[in-house]
Amino acid sequence: MEYLIKVEPDVDIFIQDVNPSGRKTILFLHGWPLSHRAYEYQFNQLPKMGYRCIGMDMRGFGNSSKPWGAYNYDRLADDVRIVVDTLQLRDFILCGHSMGGAISIRYMARHNGYGVSKLALLGAAAPSVTQRPDYPYGVPKEDVTKLIQASLNDRPKMLRDLCDMFFFQYLTMPLQDWFFQTCLQAASWSTAACAMTFRDEALFSDLGKVQVPTLIMHGIHDKICLFPLAQVLNQSIRNSTLIPFEYSGHGLFYEERDKLNKELAQFIG
């Protein structure tokens, strides 16, 4: 099933709902600058195991509305809450990749984890993508600023270059094209605005508010959200488990899709 959920008067969020009668529900939040399509290789398999898989395009991306305006973590987490309320989701698993992981953490803190029974973080862009005083683990802020400038001046080239950074394993040219076209669905202004958000915002104060079992999966070759970020998350979130993905970069949802699906299913039960 596919439908739109209104989160503001002129802003609709696209939802893909696979196996609505599944015994347990997983709400997937995609990373920057992708869409729900990033989870294609989860949606191929997890419904066979009895799970309901809901993919949500964040505002500005995929098939959702692309308004001018705020793309901060609070606004994006509030969109998630409206989707949860509209679909009347309870006792569901929240799964976020990259920036979607950061939004998931903000949702847990800002909305007290409403409805969430377990949390899965995949290559999460948290607690901070960029380096800060007393936090040397991220990338330099200037690196993200260059991405923003490229987004606003030659977005297609930026996305081609991003694909090279995104994956550790070899990708066929058709798959690279799929990644490229998926990213191009976003608006240039939302692509840049979200990059500003993960450059400037941090989630250190949110981590202690995560009160549910949490599975952290992260590629050890990740060049975008470096692996030490996952180690900080593991140290800071109570009742969390870290599983390194030894043959993945940032694209672990594809690069080690079988392992990811297996670990996620075991975690959910």
Where on the chain are the PLM-derived regions?
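Alpha/beta-hydrolase fold catalytic core
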Residues: 1-27, 48-51, 85, 90, ...
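Conserved HGGG/HGGXW glycine-rich cap/lid loop of the alpha/beta-hydrolase fold
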Residues: 14-69
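Conserved acidic catalytic loop of the alpha/beta-hydrolase fold
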Residues: 75-92
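Flexible "cap/lid" loop of the alpha/beta hydrolase fold
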Residues: 105-110, 114-153
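Conserved alpha/beta-hydrolase catalytic His-Asp/Glu region
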Residues: 130, 134-139, 149-208
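Short beta-strand/loop motif that positions the catalytic acidic residue
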Residues: 210, 216-218
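Acidic catalytic loop of the alpha/beta-hydrolase fold
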Residues: 221-225
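Catalytic active-site module of serine/aspartate enzymes centered on a nucleophile-bearing elbow/loop
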Residues: 240-269
